[in-house]
Regions:
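Adenine nucleotide-associated cytosolic modules
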Residues: 1-317
Length: 317
């Protein structure tokens, strides 16, 4: 093991003898009686294994017993990572820099001691298909690619219009060109190593960003493919549910439940399904679309990382 303080955790002194690891109250740990032993922290940069850390500390005048105590406290507090060198060496310098923050966040979120290596491996093997390349769909695809998902494919048969342009997705250069091709360009600018070709394989998850497409959801349910519904209209956006066929309610179930409360819902739903391309991202402004895309990406990544739907996040979560 080559111990390193988990990326993102900051070491600060509360007083001369108490070292605090992390600032967020949910993760912060205070280690008392540290004194000069705090110098051991500077040796935990991932370049040394346990024995080399002990040797370097000894050269600095720190006893073996003290080093072992510090390492034991940090390990017990879940503040150490051991990211395999092979994982880093397999990445290009640019990818390593881009993925580094993803690994740090994953390691903190899931409590892994491998520096996020397991999470990275799962994401790189994952395949997500995004249906719809409007402001929301293009944003979701770009975020997933940037977060390390190995294959992101976008299905959309339309051409890009001014209403599709967004800092989080398609740009001026994509106007009047196929939206799906525009998403490929978005991904290639961020993560050129991500696969974008649609060869018809079965995805690990599908994201539905176009409203009023019940037959699409039904097809995914029949195929047993997990899918996340995302909608934005009339200034309101909804992320979810994330449907796991055979394990959770499907979108059809929700429509039936709504029909019990509102007998006119089937008629309304049929009209929404026939609204055509003009209903895409209707009244979902740029900021809302970007927010929805980010929240959808959070849900997708949680599912890929753990096999379970994520939870809504907020500043106080």
């Amino acid at each position: 093991m080559r111990p390193v303080l988990k990326a993102g955790l900051r070491a600060v002194w509360r007083d001369r003898d108490t070292l605090q690891i992390g600032v967020d109250p949910r993760r912060a740990v205070a280690l008392s009686g540290m004194g000069d032993a705090g110098r051991v922290i500077s040796l935990l940069d991932g370049s040394r294994d346990w024995a080399e850390v002990v040797a370097a500390a000894k050269d600095a005048g720190i006893s073996v017993k003290t080093v072992q105590r510090v390492l034991g406290l940090l390990a017990g507090a879940g503040a150490l990572s051991d990211l395999p060198l092979a994982t880093l060496n397999a990445l290009t310098p640019v990818t390593r820099g881009r993925i580094g923050t993803e690994l740090a966040t994953a390691s903190l979120t899931y409590g892994d001691s491998d520096g996020g290596a397991r999470t990275l491996a799962r994401r790189r093997l994952a395949f997500v298909r995004v249906h719809g390349a409007g402001r929301i769909g293009a944003g979701v695809a770009g975020l997933l690619a940037a977060a390390g998902v190995g294959q992101v494919v976008c299905r959309d048969g339309g051409l890009a219009g001014p209403q599709d342009l967004s800092p989080a997705g398609l740009g001026l250069a994509d106007l009047d060109l196929p939206r799906a091709d525009g998403v490929v360009r978005v991904i290639s600018r961020i993560a050129p190593d991500v696969q974008t070709a649609d060869r018809g394989e079965r995805p690990d998850l599908a994201v539905l960003t176009e409203p009023g497409q019940p037959e699409q959801a039904a097809e995914l349910t029949r195929a047993g493919i997990a899918h996340l519904a995302v909608a934005g209209a009339e200034g309101v956006a909804v992320v979810g549910p994330l449907v796991r066929p055979g394990r959770s309610a499907c979108l059809r179930c929700l429509d039936l439940a709504r029909s019990e409360r509102d007998p006119a819902w089937p008629l309304i739903l049929a009209q929404l399904a026939g609204a055509g391309d003009g209903a895409r991202d209707g009244s979902c402004d740029t900021v809302l679309a970007a927010t929805v895309a980010a929240q959808a990406a959070v849900q997708v990544l949680a599912f890929l990382d753990t096999g379970r739907p994520g939870r809504a996040v907020s500043d106080g979560a």
